Each structure stands twice: as structure tokens, then as C-alpha cells.
Amino acid sequence: MQQTYKPNTSALKDGAPKATVDQKQLLPCKYRVGRVLGGGTYATVREAVHIETNKMYAAKIMNKKMMEKKQDFVKNEIAILKRVSYEHPNILHLVDFFETVNNLYLITELATGGELFDRICAKGSFYEADAAALMRTTTSAVKYLHDNGIVHRDLKPENLLYRSKDPNSDLLIADFGLSHFYEDSQYYMLMTACGTPEYMAPEVFRRTGYGKPVDMWAIGVITYFLLSGYTPFARPSQVEVIEAILANEYTFNDPCWSGISETAKDFIKKCLENDPSKRLTAADALKHPFLSEKRPATSNLLPNVRENFNARKTFRTAYNAVRAFNTWKKLENKH
């Protein structure tokens, strides 16, 4: 069966890499897809090579039938990427988007440098100044999103990718699948609970409405994670995570925090302010001494960060195994 190609070339800005060739060309002749990079309930992300130019991209492939009631999310993601692509060096670029009879395709640049935390762990050292530089870059990109009326809603280390393996590669904010337009002038408050629980702000769980401050809460959680190797509200179960977030229960009591400056802790506290109206804005965060001033020399944080991360990962694996076993025993006893 011949597949219909519906080009949307308005996504491409002047000067952007052109993935589109002959507009009459039919899919699947335009791109050749390769290995799977990731996926979820509604989409698969694969490597894609443009046949004409041989350039590599990432293709987010969404089955129309599976997305039947979720197509607004796709349109929203495309609209957001169209607004911000190519205007900021630290935001993943949209290259093209189109549809076939069965699928929707979203083509973006291929970030080959890996995830933020993996890059950190592969290094021989990591200092507070390195964490500050990374968060300065990320906060600058978040400010750009907010200035353009966009809330990301799913900021976390897994969505911070390096453009290439080059040591000086740009760090990119990726995955705008949960992002949303938000105009302050409309006094519109988002209500949908979405994101990754450990990085979600308390107002999201309260269902009282939320906006741009949720991204700054996530900035605080990410900063805490980079400096320690664990998130501030890490708990054995998701229910306990949510309870800790709502109660704003976190500390700097672990020995790993003894070598972290009070300036860094103050930055985290102001991002993790329970009241969103008192939380740092992206603009204010960039003026905070942690991001705006040169950080003092500190000891290498990497050994502690690695140790804490691996210890909690092992604990969580064991906890999940015990929980699965107990669930299985309950089911077995019912029969």
C-alpha cells in the first residue's frame, strides 16, 4: 500500500539543517530507521538516517491507533518545538515532522553524547563548580522556555542530554512530550498531574493548579541529586515519596553534604520552597550566587556521588524484588 507523505516544512527555520528533500517523495523512501533508542507506551524512538544527505537523526514514531485520544499531546509537542527550536543552543532541535497512514513521525537532532549523569560518572572528577556550571546552563534554557510561555513539566537528569561525545558539547533539554504552553496574562493554571514523582512539585499533587514554578522545583531536585547522588525525597515507595514532597521533608545531614557550600544549599532551599509564589524564578536563580559567582575550590564529589547513587539503586532493586515476591505470595494464597 502506498503511504501518503504530508510534509510540514514550517517546522524548519532558515539556516537549520534541512532534512526535507523532494516534497513529492513518498515515505518510507525519505528516512531509513535503525536501532531503537528508547520507547514508552505510545511511542518508540529510533535512529533515522536521511537517505539523501546520510545525516543521522532521532525519529519519535507514534502509532496513530495507540495515540487516538492523545494526538493533542503530539500537536502540542510539535508546536512547542517549532516555537523554541534553533533559538537556544541548549534545547533539542526539531528537524521535521510528518505522518503516514499508520504513524506520526517527529524528527529531531540525534543527541549522541549520552545522558547528563552517565557523563558525570564517566569522568575522573566532579566538583561543586561543575554542578553549578551545568545548572547555570539548564536554568538559562528553562528561562528561555518560560519567557516563551512554555512549562517543561518533566525536567530530570534523564532528559538532559549531550549533543555529542565532544568534551565541550552542549547540554540539551530534551523530551517535550509533557510540556505545555502557559501564558501568565491568561491567569491559567495547569491541573493535570504528570511528570516523574521524585522531581514533581507539591502543588502538582495538591491539584490546586500550577505553572512555571514546577520547573524551578525540578531544578532544585536536580541540583541536590548532582551534588549528592540521590534525590532529596528518595523513599522506598512512591507513596512515601509523595508524602515527603508534600511535607517538604529533606535534609543535608548525610556526611556527603559536609563539603558542600552553604551557598549551594541555599540555592536548593530556595528552589524547593513549598510555596510556589516564593520559589526562585529562572531569572532570579541565574542571579543567585551559586550560579552567578565563581565557586570556591572543593573536594572531588564524584566518589560520594557514585557510592550514594549505586547504594540507593541496589536498595531500590532489592525493595522492588521483595514487594514483587510479597504480591506474588498474596496472589498465590488467594488461589
From Swiss-Prot:
Family: Belongs to the protein kinase superfamily. CAMK Ser/Thr protein kinase family. CaMK subfamily.
Stored PROSITE patterns: PROTEIN_KINASE_ATP (PS00107), PROTEIN_KINASE_DOM (PS50011), PROTEIN_KINASE_ST (PS00108)
GO terms, molecular function: ATP binding; calcium/calmodulin-dependent protein kinase activity; calmodulin binding; protein kinase activity; protein serine kinase activity
Modified residues (Phosphothreonine): 192
Chain's role: Important in cell cycle regulation.
Protein name, UniProt field: Calcium/calmodulin-dependent protein kinase type I
UniProt binding sites for ATP: 37-45
Domain of life of the native organism: Eukaryota
Kinase keyword on record: yes
Entries under InterPro entries matching the protein: Kinase-like_dom_sf (IPR011009), Prot_kinase_dom (IPR000719), Protein_kinase_ATP_BS (IPR017441), Ser/Thr_kinase_AS (IPR008271)
PANTHER family per the UniProt record, alphabetical: SERINE/THREONINE-PROTEIN KINASE
Keywords recorded for this protein, A-Z: ATP-binding, Calmodulin-binding, Cytoplasm, Kinase, Nucleotide-binding, Phosphoprotein, Serine/threonine-protein kinase, Transferase
Region: Calmodulin-binding, residue numbers: 310-334
Subcellular location(s) of the protein: Cytoplasm
Catalytic reaction annotation: L-seryl-[protein] + ATP = O-phospho-L-seryl-[protein] + ADP + H(+); L-threonyl-[protein] + ATP = O-phospho-L-threonyl-[protein] + ADP + H(+)
Signal peptide location: none
Record carries keyword Nucleotide-binding: yes
Positions of the catalytic residues: 154
GO cellular component terms, semicolon-separated: cytoplasm; cytosol; nucleus
Broad enzyme group: transferase
